[in-house]
Amino acid sequence: IMQTPGLIVKSIPEYDRISGWQVQAQNDGLLTDAAGDSYDFLFYESMTERTLFDREEGFYISAQNRTAQWEEILSAYGFSGQEISDFIEFWDAKLEKEDYIMYPQYTETVDEAMPVEIIPAPEHLIRMWFGFELYDGQQYQEAEILPFDRTGYTVVEWGGMIF
């Protein structure tokens, strides 16, 4: 898996700036590298250009009810139970206990921000980041949820950023 190496600032496992991540995916999603180490997912933090991201359509996420809201939204998109749990664990710790607008960013936008090459190419590549912006009464349009197609060899990436 190759991404734009200059943009990656942190990764697990370590991202090789020449060859990328060299992992083999099993049918159950487990990833194994050449050393035999296994991973449930690949993690990275990156520097990205915020102006690429849409802030027109989103979801109001209340501080008091965000876990249930995230579960409902992510489930409707088609994220797995484990992906939803990982998302909640990661973002609940990162965000202040405030209300947010959560703006979905789809594969095309994420590809612009952080290009990726996967060999062999998956049948379905689902890359979804969410932009989080503190809610202060700003106008937004409710985002429409279009469930993904996860049939066959599918790669799913989720992530986000705080605006």
Model-derived features: where do they sit?
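Protease-labile, long low-complexity intrinsically disordered regions enriched in Pro/Ser/Thr
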Residues: 1-163
